[in-house]
From Swiss-Prot:
Membrane topology, as annotated: Multi-pass membrane protein
Transmembrane segments: 36-56, 92-112, 127-147, 176-196, 200-220, 240-260
Keywords linked to the UniProt accession: Cell inner membrane, Cell membrane, Membrane, Transmembrane, Transmembrane helix
Keyword Transmembrane: yes
InterPro entries assigned to the protein according to its UniProt record, in alphabetical order: UPF0761_bac, Virul_fac_BrkB
One CC-aspect GO term: plasma membrane
A Pfam family matched in the record: Virul_fac_BrkB
Protein name: UPF0761 membrane protein HS_0693
Keyword Protein biosynthesis among UniProt keywords: no
The species this protein was found in: Histophilus somni (strain 129Pt)
Similarity-based family: Belongs to the UPF0761 family.
The organism's place on the tree of life at top rank: Bacteria
Locations listed in the record: Cell inner membrane
Amino acid sequence: MSNLCRNIKVFFKVFLYRFKQNKLNQAAGYLTYSTTLALVPLIMVFFSVFAAFPVFNEITGELKQFIFTNFAPSTGDAVGEYIDQFVNNSKQMSAVGIISLIVVALMLIHSIDRTLNSIWLDTSVRPAIFSFAIYWLILTLGPIVIATSIGISTYVTKFATYTFEQDFGLSVGIKLLSLMPFFLTWFIFTVLYMVVPNKKVSIIHSAAGALIAAVFFTLGKQAFTWYITTFPSYQLIYGAMATLPIMLLWIQLSWTAVLLGAQLSAVLADIRSLDCGNIQIEKIKEEK
């Protein structure tokens, strides 16, 4: 029991130190700014990739619903209309303009890469060509992986709903439907924490950090939606511009949840090093 209390104390001690050291609040604000600039270019690239694969036509609407519901709660319809309009306008752009949008989207991926690697205290730098190749793969294959995951989750949910309602007359399928976005979010965060850092990250540590991030993300979404629907005073202040600050605030909260999960994964590796005697807590504090 004493060892458990000691381990918990050491964990929170290291976690709080790393939180301050990595300045996660500032990092979340930086990523919020980068995301705001790259939101339209990123979505334009995503749906352009979908358009190149007719097999994804049936789930494009479901993908939009997933994005707007999870990343713009309570304002999804308004944000969706704006983004659809921006994407349609981008189709009329010249080649130079399209390349500029792609560059902005790649810069966001670079910002995420650099921020997550700083959490793992990895200062190594990849060759520029290698980094560009990875970012380009993420930008092009990422939409396919996400669309496939959403398509599979939708199929499993529909199958479970039909099976349980036919065999048992229960609403278990509906409950599964409500849980699928959470498990999909957990899966995406786990892959993010495993793939992005230059260091090798244990799948257990990645899944643990991703679980906490998914829980905070889901609970934060529900709490945020409840607040802005229960206390709509912001609409009186901002009027027609209310959607913008709401979206910015939610992006900030979302990145905070993602970075907290990443920090947890990194700290678990630190704790393991402490347990194995490979590193001392004084050495952790000396790292910059």
